[in-house]
Amino acid sequence: DKRTKKVGIVGKYGVRYGASLRKTIKKIEISQHAKYNCNFCGKDSLKRKAAGIWECKACKKVVAGGAYVCSTTAATTIRAAIRRLRDAHES
């Protein structure tokens, strides 16, 4: 049985800090505790070690990422730009 219906992981804060702040924190905490896909071994075992440090539990690789999410939107944009430039350079 579920203990909470809507508060989820931020139930630990109880009535403190205000509803909208707790809602924001809920999104962050869910993403930071989630398991992500490892680019090296392909398994869903990349977990947050510290702010911006992500470690794969399977292959023990450590990668830098976002503070709360493994890959940031800025990093994705840069990666796409680099790939596009590399393809243009090769052809």
Curated annotation (Swiss-Prot):
ZnF locations on chain (C4-type): 38-59
Pfam families: Ribosomal_L37ae
InterPro entries xrefs: Ribosomal_eL37/eL43 (IPR011331), Ribosomal_eL43 (IPR002674), Ribosomal_protein_eL43 (IPR050522), Ribosomal_zn-bd (IPR011332)
GO biological process, one term: translation
Cellular component GO terms held in the UniProt record: ribonucleoprotein complex; ribosome
One MF annotation (Gene Ontology) recorded for this entry: zinc ion binding
Keywords: Metal-binding, Ribonucleoprotein, Ribosomal protein, Zinc, Zinc-finger
Alphabetical list of NCBIfam families matching this protein: eL43_euk_arch, PRK03976.1
Protein family per UniProt: Belongs to the eukaryotic ribosomal protein eL43 family.
Protein name: Large ribosomal subunit protein eL43
